Amino acid sequence: RGAKAMGIHTALDTSGFLGAACTDAMLDDIDLVLLDVKSGLPDTYRRVTGRDLQPTLDFGRRLAARGIQIWVRFVLVPGLTDDPANVEAVADYVAGLATVTRVEVLPFHQMGRDKWASLGMRYELEDTPAPSPELVERVRDQFRSRALEVY
C-alpha cells in the first residue's frame, strides 16, 4: 500500500483465478495487471489448468470497470491452446476489455522441463514442440484483427 503513496508503479501478475479475493482497497493500489488468459473456451481452460474459466473472465471485467490498465498474456501451446476457435474466444474477450493496452502472445518453450523432473513429477508437455513462427504470427494476427496492440 505504501509503494503507490511513494510514487512507485505497482503491478499484479495473475491468472485472475483468485481475483474475487482482491478487495477494492487492494485494487486501488494497483496501476497495472498482467493477466494470463490461458484459454477462451471453458473446456480448454479446464484441460490446461484444471480449473474454471469464469473467475478469470470476471476478474478481467472487474479490472476494466475500475479503469485499471491490463496487459494480457496468452501462452501459445501447440495442440493445446492453438485451436483457432480458442484463440478467437480469447481475442473476443480481450477486445471487450477497454483498459487492455497490450497483448503478449508467448510461444511455448521447454525451459521448465527440469523443474518437473526435480519435483519428481511427470511433465505432461514433454513431447510438445515450440510453435512455428507461422503459427505465432497467425495467432498474433487474430488479436490484431481486433485492433489490439500485440507483441
Regions from the PLM with identified roles:
Residues 92-95, 101, 117-142:
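A structural motif corresponding to the C-terminal lobe/cap of the Radical SAM core domain
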